[in-house]
Each structure stands twice: as C-alpha cells, then as structure tokens.
Design a protein with these regions (language model features):
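Membrane-interface helix-loop junctions in multi-pass transporters/channels
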Residues: 1-128
Length: 128
C-alpha cells in the first residue's frame, strides 16, 4: 500500500509541475501553432528519468523512492497522450511538415535527453 501512495504522491507532484508549464508564455513557431510546451515537457521528463536511472545505477535508492520519482513524478509530468493528440491535430490541419518535425523532435530529443541525464549522473557521481 505504501508503494501505491508513493506513486500517487509523485503523480500528483508531476501533474502539478506539468500544469505550471502551461503558464510559460510559449511563442508560436511559424504560421502553425507548434506544440512546444508538450515537446519541452516530454524532453525534460525524459532527462529527469535518465537522471533517476543514473542515480539508481551509481548510488542506488530505495525501490519506493524509484516508484515515487520514476513512475509517479515522471509519469504524471510527461504527456504522451497529449503528444499523440497534438500530432493528429497538426495532420488534420494539413500541417504535415510541422507534424513530422514535432514527432521526430519528440522522439530524438526525448531519447537524447534520457541518455544525457544518465551520462550527467555518471560524471557527477564519478562513474564513467
């Protein structure tokens, strides 16, 4: 039951952080409204989950703390369903190039940020 509460608390924190990003005055890219907030959210969440994995690999933290941070915070913060909906919206409006750019950037930057987070922890904590 404590594991469930850890995920619940982390998920709430992640969701609130995600909501707070909606207050950032994002600029529109070009003539098409580009979903920059979701892209930033998912890349940042990927970086954070990479940090968590790096810390677990180098220092180890309790399984409950991993559930709180990885499943809870990152799960509540990142927004794959919003990514899918916004991608479909761009396609529906005929904005094929921005849709392709958004999907490719989300994937490439998300994976890259996850790797960067793990590498950063390795460097900071002395693991090569």
């Amino acid at each position: 039951m404590l594991d469930v509460l850890a995920v619940f608390a982390g998920g709430g924190l992640g969701a609130v952080c995600r909501h707070l990003l909606t207050f950032v005055p994002w600029k529109t890219v070009g003539a098409v409204e580009f979903p920059l907030a979701t892209l930033v959210t998912n890349v940042l969440g990927s970086f954070v989950i990479g940090l968590i994995v790096g810390v677990v690999a180098t220092r180890g933290i309790s399984p409950r703390a991993v559930l709180f941070a990885k499943t809870g915070i990152c799960g509540g913060f990142t927004t794959f369903s919003t990514f899918a909906l916004e991608s479909q919206g761009l396609i529906d409006r005929g904005a094929y190039a921005p849709a392709a750019a958004y999907m490719l950037l989300s994937f490439a930057l998300g994976v890259g940020a996850c790797v960067a987070g793990q590498l950063l922890v390795g460097r900071l904590l002395g693991r090569s």
